[in-house]
Amino acid sequence: MEHQSSNQSRSRNGNDFEKVFTEVTGITKMKKKDKPSFINSHGIHQLIDFDFTTEINGTKVYIDVTTTYRSDRQKQKAYNALMMKNKVNMDCKFYMVIKSLVENGKPKTVNLLEGMDGVMDINDFINLIK
């Protein structure tokens, strides 16, 4: 039961952060039916997953938001970005927006992966879209 409660708490925190993101940016969450997809080399329909999309200076921008930074999560999002840029052949930007890049008083180290155009906290993203 403790594990389930912990997962529910993380899910609730993530949903709350998505709501805050929408409130402060005015960008609404994407619906699954509107997300791009392609047929991969194995003949399987593959969805390119992200949370939000907007345009900045005429460029389509895809955003994934999360409460904490983890390198494995960035790897997943970098893969999505590469698929969007290479398989769907779309000129676009991909950003990962984190609630805070400081955890337990220490700044998180971010190594940007191929496909990603930026990993930043919400305040830096707000400055980007101004």
Can you describe what each PLM-predicted range is?
Residues 52-67, 77:
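Conserved catalytic cores of phosphodiester-cleaving nucleases, focusing on short active-site segments
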Residues 70-91, 95:
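Short, charged, amphipathic alpha-helix that recurs within catalytic cores of restriction-modification
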Residues 45-49:
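Short, flexible loop/turn motifs enriched in small residues
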Residues 60-62, 90-98, 117:
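Hydrophobic beta-strand segments of well-ordered beta-sheets in folded domains
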Residues 96-130:
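Domain-level recognition of nuclease-like catalytic cores that cleave nucleotide substrates
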Residues 6-8, 64-69:
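Surface-exposed cleft-lining segments at the edges of enzyme active sites
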Residues 67-72, 101-104:
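Short acidic, S/G/P-rich loop/turn micro-motifs used as interaction or catalytic elements
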Residues 1-41:
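Acidic-basic catalytic patches of nuclease active cores, encompassing PD-(D/E)XK
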